[in-house]
């Protein structure tokens, strides 16, 4: 067995927060060892994992490992240290049992200490950007009477409205949560509006005299039509030439809708930035040197401070699954992977999907998302996979989910053909489907059941990789496009980021069914 004690000791002693290589080595070791129950049951290794988390100030590792704040009892090999003095510095002001990571605390402190409290935070997926928003709101609860939170989708709006309702209730705050513009407002009441950009514009139009003290704008990259994820002039020239060659008739509906929504995002942010003094903007994987001219001008003219965080707390393993072998690409500090699987030569895509899903199941790697470029593809792939699987796990479903399926059968029983509807058949086989063409309440129920563990495979489109949170450990990228457009490096980063959510798992695996770069 590999000498993880020596490796951890060496990585801890050579850890330098300003050296990305030493940071990544210690992260990879901590995540890899923590993901192995047998390894971390060793008392020396457990103590080293605790010390590594404390030294990195990435406290989510200890929380996920169920390590207490007090040091693990000394084994005699290592000096005993007290962790409480460290963790108390990073304790959440909202929930005292939560500990902020060092970089998270830096974001909160930076906002609080700014002369002009306007901040753009770029951080990896699942970093906790909305969690930090709640910290900021709590610290300023006596100053902020009306708060506006803007999220890009209705699914995110509903998820965050529930979180904010709990936040207000748990802390006995004097706020009323509002999700729709069709309400009567009272000057004596404090409000937290949780809206999409479209609803934010409706609010501004309906209540022009309403004073908003603070706003939060999520997925802010959507407002920059010039944003280029790889930042090369050559790619910008290619993109411009491609668009010029297209006639109006050739521009897809999806492209038109994306452009239209982009304008809505920009107008909403522009109007809010002109009337609100303090705000916090957030987005994933944004690199300032790749911002378009419009975004740079917006940041400068509004005196917005930019905070970039590049550290990924989860070990993410790339897995090639597009040849005849499934091969995991391991970091140098970890042993070469013996976890390989074979795919029959010339296997068609649906057979290949079955092999990869079976590989994940046999390795007990956990829950899996399968990214598809359209609802049609999600339906096609899921039906094919369901047809290749012998099991039907409907009888093992919890009663509330059985009732949900029965409700769908009653509600959508058109010409008594609902039993033939592929969606029902796929659900009964234990696979979820999530895309924007499904009614919102169905999307929400499917997502909740996936997170509860009712089923562990879900076919999805871009609707679930643009901010909706799951606890999936694996992502299989089936298509290299989104709608009719090729995935950009920025899109790929966001999709990859859905495998291995921080605070839920240590290791995420991304399976590539084709060479997407």
Task: Name each model-derived stretch.
Residues 1-517:
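N-terminal helicase ATP-binding lobe
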């Amino acid at each position: 067995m590999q000498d993880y004690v020596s490796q951890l000791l060496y990585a801890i002693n050579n850890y330098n927060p300003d050296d990305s290589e030493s940071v990544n080595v210690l992260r990879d070791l901590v995540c890899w060892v923590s993901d192995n129950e047998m390894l971390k049951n060793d008392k020396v290794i457990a103590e080293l994992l605790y010390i590594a988390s404390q030294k990195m100030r990435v406290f989510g590792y200890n929380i996920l490992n169920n390590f207490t704040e007090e040091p693990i009892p000394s084994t005699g090999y290592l000096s005993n240290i007290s962790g409480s003095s460290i963790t108390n510095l990073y304790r959440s002001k909202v929930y005292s049992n939560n500990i902020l990571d060092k970089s998270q605390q830096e974001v909160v402190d930076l906002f609080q200490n700014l002369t002009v409290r306007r901040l753009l935070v770029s951080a990896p997926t699942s970093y906790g950007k909305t969690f930090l928003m709640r910290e900021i709101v709590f610290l300023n609860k006596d100053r902020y009477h009306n708060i506006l939170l803007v999220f890009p989708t209705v699914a995110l709006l509903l998820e965050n409205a529930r979180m904010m309702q709990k936040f207000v209730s748990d802390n006995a705050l004097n706020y009323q949560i509002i999700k729709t513009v069709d309400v009567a407002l009272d000057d004596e009441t404090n409000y937290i509006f949780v809206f999409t950009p479209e609803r934010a514009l409706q609010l501004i139009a309906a209540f022009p005299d309403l004073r908003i003290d603070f706003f939060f704008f999520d997925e802010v990259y959507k407002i920059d039509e010039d944003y280029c994820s790889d930042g090369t002039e050559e790619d910008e020239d290619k993109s411009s030439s491609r668009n010029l060659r297209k006639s109006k008739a050739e521009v897809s509906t999806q492209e038109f809708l994306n452009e239209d929504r982009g304008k809505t995002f920009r107008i909403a942010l522009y109007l809010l930035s002109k009337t609100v003094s303090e705000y916090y903007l957030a987005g994933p994987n944004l690199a300032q040197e790749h911002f378009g001219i419009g975004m740079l001008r917006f940041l400068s003219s509004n005196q917005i401070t930019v905070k970039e965080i590049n550290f990924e707390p989860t070990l993410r393993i790339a897995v090639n699954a597009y040849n005849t072998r499934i091969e995991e690409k391991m970091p140098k500090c970890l042993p070469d992977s013996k976890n390989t699987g074979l795919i029959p030569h010339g296997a068609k895509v649906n057979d290949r999907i079955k092999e990869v899903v079976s590989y994940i199941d046999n390795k007990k790697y956990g829950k899996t998302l399968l990214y598809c470029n359209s609802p049609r593809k999600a339906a096609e792939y899921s039906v094919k996979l369901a047809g290749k699987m012998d099991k039907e796990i409907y009888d093992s479903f919890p009663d509330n989910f059985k009732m949900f399926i029965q409700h769908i059968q009653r509600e959508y029983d058109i010409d008594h053909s609902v039993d033939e509807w592929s969606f029902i058949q796929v659900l009964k086989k234990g696979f979820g489907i999530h895309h924007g063409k499904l009614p919102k309440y169905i999307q929400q129920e499917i997502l909740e059941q996936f997170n509860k563990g009712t089923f562990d495979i879900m076919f999805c489109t871009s609707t679930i990789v643009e901010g909706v949170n799951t606890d999936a450990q694996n992502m299989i990228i089936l298509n290299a496009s989104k709608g009719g457009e090729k995935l950009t490096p920025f899109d790929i980063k966001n999709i990859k980021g859905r495998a291995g959510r921080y605070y839920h798992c240590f290791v995420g695996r991304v399976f590539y069914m084709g060479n997407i770069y």
